[in-house]
């Protein structure tokens, strides 16, 4: 069965429920078709994912679609680019996503939480600007990232080997980075919110000066950053929640032991872990504890 997707219509209706008959809406000159026809095995998997979750997994799409957002300035100053994936590689990437992403959530939750559009790429890259004092100008380069989200879409990078050939550490690193981007996107869309008890513990009006002060105040490192975010003047509830979520998917229970010696960190950890399980059905400790063979 061929499912006709009008991407512009999807974008216009992105706030609507996923059971809307998007496939029946035609926009001349802007139609995507599932299956996309690049690889039969990948197309079969993608149709099954559509039937299961109501999301459109696309491996052929335009740069305009990649950068499209309904929310102005949602990227801030960040600039991203992508390299398209060869259709024959899509099945392997879907195998990896099943292992490191979908397997950790209930089908019902993902049907609600997954973005409408999931762009499958060879590589997603972030533009890095570094000031060179010698030439008194910025030098631009590109940094590979595992994923990038905008409102109701996420773009995901491929790996350069089969899932079977990936080491346990490679799978874990991929899982941790992808999960942190996914969860951050859910915070941005208010699909996941922190409970009031979590927010009430830390004082967001007082800056901290070092790591010790940060832990005593109940703030943890965000492992996706190379600096202590809470001493950088970014004391917001969302940054706090994102730091805990990223730490939870990056770290095992053993790796949490030192931070949990701080009373406020322990309180917030326990509150958030319990809240995610009862409110969303997410066993986030299991995600962090998963070590592959």
Predicted regions span which residues?
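Positively charged n-region of N-terminal signal peptides that target proteins for export
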Residues: 1-5
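C-terminal motif of bacterial Sec signal peptides marking the signal peptidase cleavage site
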Residues: 12-15
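Acidic/polar, low-complexity intrinsically disordered N-terminal segments immediately downstream
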Residues: 17-108, 251-293
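Auxiliary, metal-adjacent structural segments of Zn-dependent hydrolase domains
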Residues: 91-151
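Structural recognition of the beta-strand scaffold that forms the well-ordered cores
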Residues: 119-120, 153-157, 242-246
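Structured domain cores in non-transmembrane regions
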Residues: 127-172, 270-273, 277-290
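Active-site recognition of the HExxH zinc-binding catalytic motif
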Residues: 150-200
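Metalloprotease/metallohydrolase-associated module, dominated by Zn2+-dependent proteases
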Residues: 202-293
């Amino acid at each position: 069965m061929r499912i006709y997707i009008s991407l512009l219509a999807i974008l216009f209706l992105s706030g609507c429920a996923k059971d809307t008959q998007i496939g029946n809406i035609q926009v001349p000159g802007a139609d995507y078709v599932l299956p996309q026809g690049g690889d039969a095995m990948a197309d079969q998997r993608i149709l099954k994912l559509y039937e299961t979750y109501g999301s459109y997994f696309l491996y052929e799409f335009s740069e305009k679609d990649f950068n499209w957002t309904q929310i102005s300035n949602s990227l801030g100053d960040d600039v991203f680019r992508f390299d398209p994936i060869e259709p024959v590689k899509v099945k392997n990437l879907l195998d990896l996503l099943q292992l490191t992403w979908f397997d950790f959530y209930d089908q019902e939750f993902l049907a609600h939480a997954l973005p409408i559009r999931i762009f499958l790429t060879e590589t997603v890259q972030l533009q890095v600007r570094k000031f060179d004092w010698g030439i008194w100008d910025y030098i631009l380069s590109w940094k590979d990232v595992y994923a990038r989200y905008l409102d109701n879409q996420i773009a995901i990078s491929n790996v350069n080997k089969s899932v079977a050939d990936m080491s346990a550490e490679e799978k874990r690193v991929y899982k941790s980075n992808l999960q942190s981007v996914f969860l951050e996107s859910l915070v941005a869309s208010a699909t996941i919110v922190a409970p009031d008890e979590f927010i009430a513990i830390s004082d967001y009006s007082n800056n901290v000066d070092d790591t010790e002060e940060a832990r005593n105040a109940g703030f943890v490192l965000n492992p996706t950053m190379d600096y202590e975010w809470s001493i950088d003047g970014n004391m917001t509830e969302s940054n706090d929640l994102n730091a805990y979520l990223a730490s939870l998917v990056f770290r095992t229970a053993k790796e949490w032991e030192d931070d949990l010696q701080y009373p406020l960190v322990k309180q917030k950890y326990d509150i958030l872990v319990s809240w995610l399980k009862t409110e969303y059905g997410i066993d986030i400790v299991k995600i962090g504890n998963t070590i592959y063979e």
